[in-house]
Amino acid sequence: ANISAGLSLGEYSALIYSNIINFEDGIKIVQKRGTYMQEYLPEGNWSMAAILGLDDKIIEDVCKQVTKGFVVPANYNCQGQVAISGEKEAVLQAMELLKEAGAKRTIELKTSGPFHTSKLQEASDKLYDALQEIQINKIADKKVIKNIDATEYTDNDDIKRILANHVINPVKFKKSIENMIDQGVDTIIEIGPGKVLSGFVKKTNKDIQVFNTNNIEAFEQIL
């Protein structure tokens, strides 16, 4: 594959696959990322929710209308599916307002933190410090689309800063898939357990050929 992307933590898999980050460094930094995101959770009662069947703009506008605390879009997964993140009372209020605005479903998620929001700034700062200990390699022939803005990584990017900012910014997975398709991608292979990302791809563009695998043998057969 000449272009790859991952959702949230999966971006590290894409960076390792493309040899932008070495495998050993990737394992170390992923472990630290998880530790910091738990250790530096701000005080409070946090939650996330999946919102189905509404345009992104409506979800963004409704989140701004919430009066019971902090809530923002955190994951733009695919057409008609966005996850919101924030204080539990604010998330619950947003879910009610979004139902009134026409959402087909709102589903509270089993999460413990305001992930991919500005509330994780301290974890982001700690991660940036830890990233100074790893090596970033020159980008060769394998492109990686980054979550933060759905564009390709380049050698001019401050990749360590981008990865630190990754935990405090929304994941733009839908736009990432759209940009890959715009570059001529017509086949996507999801690597990992389950078929969640394959579903996101199909909802974004039903004409794309999608394969799913969780082992090397099957992956090689697909190729």
PLM feature segments, named:
Residues S4-G6, G26, P73, I188-E190:
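Short glycine-aspartate micro-motif
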Residues Y17-I168:
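Alpha/beta catalytic cores of group-transfer enzymes, especially the acyltransferase/condensing modules
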Residues N2, G6-G10, N22:
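Gly/Ala-rich beta-loop-alpha elbow adjacent to hydrolase catalytic centers
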Residues A1, D129-Q132, I136-L223:
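Acyltransferase/transacylase module recognition
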Residues S8, G102, G184:
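Conserved functional loop/turn residues at catalytic and ligand-binding sites
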Residues L9, E87, I191-P193:
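Glycine-rich beta-strand-to-loop/alpha-helix junction loops that act as flexible
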